From Swiss-Prot:
Belongs to the gas vesicle GvpA family. The gene is gvpA. Residues 74-138 are annotated as: Disordered. It comes from the Bacteria. The keyword Ribosomal protein does not apply. Keywords: Gas vesicle. This is Gas vesicle protein A. Induction: Gas vesicle production is induced by growth conditions that promote production of secondary metabolites tiancimycin A and B. The gas vesicle shell is 2 nm thick and consists of a single layer of this protein. It forms helical ribs nearly perpendicular to the long axis of the vesicle. GO terms for molecular function: structural molecule activity.
Length: 138
């Protein structure tokens, strides 16, 4: 009777892999951890966390970003205005209204002064009250 010794190791080609082999595989295939968290309270964005951890070659990352349409996170018409944008718009509109009111008031005062010096003081006060009524209606 003949005894054949059992072979050690399975059907794998190589029994060990080093750190170099693991890094080569990760860089070739890529490892991407992408997380997006938004916390809103009553429609106001309180916290926004957008994290992307990439361990990959540049080519692998660019293929991933193109596939997910994530090359530029904040671009495009879908970008929601944040709190600084909203505050800035309100400040600009308020300043625009105040400057418009100040300029129209200055122009009105000058025109009243010119009318008052040529026609008398009684007609000037009535036109001034009429213009104030128009301003209040607007």
């Amino acid at each position: 009777m003949t005894v054949v010794p059992a072979q050690q190791g399975g059907g794998g080609a190589r029994g060990t892999s080093g750190l170099y082999d693991v890094l080569e595989l990760v860089l070739d295939r890529g490892l991407v951890i992408d997380a997006f968290v938004r916390v809103s309270l009553v429609g106001i964005e309180i916290l926004k966390i957008d994290v992307r951890v990439v361990v990959a070659s540049v080519d692998t990352y660019l293929r991933f970003a193109e596939a997910c349409n994530r090359l530029d996170l904040e671009a495009g018409p879908r970008k929601d205005p944040g709190l600084p944008d909203l505050v800035g718009e309100m400040t600009e509109s308020g300043a625009r209204g105040k400057s418009k009111g100040a300029l129209s008031g200055a122009a009105e005062t000058i025109s009243d002064a010119l009318k008052g010096s040529s026609s008398g003081s009684s007609s000037g006060s009535s036109s001034r009250s009429t213009s104030r009524k128009k301003e209040e209606q607007e």
